[in-house]
């Protein structure tokens, strides 16, 4: 069978325990790990040997060549990510083995290059000297040698050819493998391409600019979008230039919108095609001085952000915080003794018996025993390292020091500062671009590489890869790390390449789209000459009018009544903002969480600050809060909002106009996230009030009445020094004076304000409000 592996060469491959576990599978049955021994320098076979760590997941029915996964970095561990990747690549595993390996010197491969563990400092000449004293040659750690390691691994495991899936740096390794070892590759899928020939520094700014302008240029190619908004790319650039002038062209909540913030909009929406679809609308509104959709995006009022696929924490991640809780239950002397015992456990501990014995002797909770019993050797060693055992272990999500060594050979020596400046000069927004002038930094990096004795790779390495294998290049249109431009350049040199753009997605598509990249890979590998398509390749469906969430949020709604029946009694209101709905309920105030998806509305059980009212007010409160919790559908038509409940009840609201600053009695309803963010005032220790009246500010901060002068001009607001009118040494309720000090400190830092309906936002230096008040009727 094409996917079957014959026994490897004797003595070159040794079994090793996997540093991970796969749910529902048995190690040694469905998956295996091991170490391939390779020569550090293939021209010196009697020299130092290196251990290349790998993992193999057996196919359900191996009828296809294996898939070799090549991780990013360089230096990221594909082996560590196996639990996540096994799930993402499950469709491919049905008919082919999945292979993962870590680069020489990185991940779980040994020896692992870790300068801090070696010389207690970062990458530099001291570390390189220490490595050389151990027989390690930094010049042997590069993409060319890594490609040879991959080819040897396939041969040692008995595979004739393999399909490749590379992500980010892994695409460079895949291309080098196709160039230098073409016989072992059948086809390749490249996700977020950075080919060997790409001048990454010189082309970074151009690629970044392309990604940020792409949605507006794409809108111009869409008849509906162009018909609604016109030439959006030109409008986007013109607005950026206007925002870079003074006075500011647009205010967002009385805060000037800076050009850099608009240019960075891509950072808020990348990887979310549904959010990218809003960009032309946002720019159109900002161009006309409107900010509703932009504010809704900043306030996260457009719905929840889907979770990005991520590796679930291993047993050591769960063990360590639980073990610390156990130690906190002991005296300081006992806890110190247990820590010493743990640090003294043997590094090699078959079955984790020594760790289990310590836990039993110390009578730790059963949950710790259970976690320890199922730990892999690597997970147990992570526990030991956390308590002081000096182990050079792979640290998840850190690339390690091989990246610096690779870059000294393959990137930094080839940077041409003049070309970098030339490329940046063609961009019409040089003053607004991020700091892409690497000239000074590059000179220092080139000098550092020379001092470390690491020279450039052969010039041929930087030549274009022209391999004839079938290649599918996947590029996210919003990728600013390995921009789409890089994939376009790489594809131009490959005679049998197909470039597939994923609109709205950014970097490392496999980790953003879930199984969608696996579906594209499956289609391509089955029929390399045929087009591929999946949900993640769909064009952007641009939003032409403000979505419901924008029309709903940031506004105060007054209950008129139930359909056909007017609401009697005290005012009832609702303000939807930043995932919270707050307002008056007939007796006091209430608050709840909410989520909008399409026209569907989900509201958590409201929390009221006053449940002691009686009579008609109590009936109104109960009826309203019950209906609010049962609401599931929302409609906004102009200045009217309709809430429908599951039992058919319809609540009718009308929009309240923005109140003036002076006149209303303002009550504090929200503190910063570090405090009691979003809670009703009664859930603070004591109510906080404020009133602005002809240059004088008066307010209760919990116990004492304060007053001071204030000055305002447009959106600017400054309060004088707060002084209590009559100072009382309040002691009840507990913490009331601390509340006064905290609120006073925030008030003294106020520099600007904004009013939306009955809500008053006070800002300090941050873009987020420091305090939020609500106007009592």
What is each of the regions a protein language model found here?
Residues 1-4:
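N-terminal Sec signal peptide cleavage junction
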Residues 6-285, 289-337, 341, 405-406, ...:
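Gly/Pro-rich cap/lid or specificity-loop segments adjacent to the active site
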Residues 224-242, 357-380:
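An acidic intrinsically disordered interaction segment
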Residues 312, 324-370:
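Ordered core of a single globular domain
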Residues 372, 377-381, 393-401:
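Extended, H/D-rich, highly charged conserved domains that either
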Residues 386-390:
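Short linear interaction motifs
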Residues 542-777:
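Lipid interaction determinants
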